[in-house]
Amino acid sequence: MTNCKPSKQQLAFLDWEFGAFFHFGLRAFYKGYRDWDTRDMDASVFNPEKLDCASWLRTCKAAGMTYAIMTCKHLDGFANWPTAYGDYSVKNTPWKNGKGDVVREFTDACREVGMKVGLYYSPAQRDQSAFDKMDYDDYFIGQITELLTGYDVSFPECHAST
């Protein structure tokens, strides 16, 4: 029998106790769409003009939460930051003339209110079969590297299956 022990980082995460997980992205603009939905979603409809991550996080903090996690990319493949790896992201939307960055606004707001910040990235993607394996690996590693080096996260959250 294997003796598995949690890492120091996993144990520290347990001490965080109470937090929020935000699932916000392109699909919020498509009523009735679900995970693994086969219908296309045009990035040009993404325009959260009233996005106020600071308001979300002030509410979380007031409720006693100590951390918040943002979904950076989910199964639809849309990146909530202006990734250099692919075009299906906030950089090709009307929101802030393609200069917006949901992940930056979220991570900055977490720090402003004194909350730990985590990022969720789904490695699974509904159009993944359109990539050859090496191309997808490069795309995946490139995006993960952007998130881990560009946003100073407290705990990166990544699952192999969702």
Language-model-derived ranges and their functions:
Residues M1-T162:
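Mature catalytic domains of secreted/periplasmic carbohydrate-active enzymes
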